[in-house]
């Protein structure tokens, strides 16, 4: 890879250290495309990934939208940054009805892109169930077992089946 970290070229993907890496460049490009229509960022990111990694690495990249280190993707796509709010406020905040509707629509579009790309689509627990949350620790809430968004869960299941059938 062309990864330079702390001033040193890293050799993570040469068979001795890692089999894959988390594809943050794709995540950021998909978010920017869905939120702001930035086609150029999407093109640049995907071309850059192909340029930096051989096909055998591209085929196993971990493609994702949410992680334990980021705001919940539904919250990001719902459009409420939570900026300027106290931890107590963030602990109890939920998206408004229209924000939730917008967030779900955007999340579906984004996940179709992730699932259609080279690499391995990954879903952070709860994203498929409509879990909301802001920065840590609010992105690490427990899975909403009795309060899942069944429409969203079914959507993720359908896309997974489509991906496997390719």
For each of these PLM feature ranges, what is it?
Residues 1-61, 113, 130-161:
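Active-site-proximal helices and loops of the catalytic beta/alpha 8
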Residues 12-19, 63-95, 111-150:
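Aromatic/acidic polysaccharide-binding cleft in carbohydrate-active enzymes
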Residues 21-28, 81-86, 103-106, 154:
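A broad, low-specificity signal for short, low-complexity segments enriched in glycine/proline
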Residues 39-49, 83-108:
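Aromatic-anchored helix/helix-loop segment that forms the rim or "lid"
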């Amino acid at each position: 890879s062309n990864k330079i970290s702390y001033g040193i070229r890293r050799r993570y993907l040469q068979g001795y250290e890692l089999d894959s890496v988390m594809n943050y460049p794709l995540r950021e490009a998909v978010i920017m495309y869905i939120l702001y229509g930035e086609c150029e960022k999407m093109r640049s990111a995907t071309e850059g990934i192909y340029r930096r990694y051989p096909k055998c690495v591209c085929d196993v990249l971990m493609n994702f939208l949410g992680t334990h280190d980021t705001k919940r993707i539904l919250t990001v796509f719902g459009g409420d940054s939570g900026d300027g709010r106290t931890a107590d406020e963030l602990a109890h905040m939920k998206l408004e009805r229209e924000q939730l509707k917008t967030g779900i629509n955007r999340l579906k579009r984004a996940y179709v892109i992730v699932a259609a790309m080279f690499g391995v689509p990954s879903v952070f627990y709860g994203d498929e169930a409509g879990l909301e949350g802001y920065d840590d620790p609010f992105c690490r809430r427990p899975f909403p077992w009795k309060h899942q968004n069944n429409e969203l869960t079914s959507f993720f299941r359908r896309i997974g089946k489509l991906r496997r059938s390719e």
